[in-house]
Amino acid sequence: MTLYSERIVFPEGDWQEAPCRLKIDQLVDPNGYPLKLPLPSPRILAFRVFRITTKMETGEEIRCYHLEQLNLLDLEEYV
C-alpha cells in the first residue's frame, strides 16, 4: 500500500501539507491556496510555484510544490 501526500516547500526550506494540487506558475497565498486573478492589490504576500518534484520514501510518494516569493514589481502585472 502506498500513501500519497503533497507539500508546499517555502524558499527558506520550511514545508507544510498542501491543501490542493497545484500547477507550475500558479500563484498561491502563504497557506498554499490558489489566488484569484486579478489580484486586489500588489501589496500582498504571494508565492509562485516554480518547480514540482516527486520523491519516493518507504511506502509513501511525496509531491513537493516548490515556491518562490514574488516582489511588488512581479505582482503589479497580476493586478
Outline where the language-model segments fall.
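Acidic surface patches and DE-rich sequence motifs
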Residues: 10, 29, 55-57
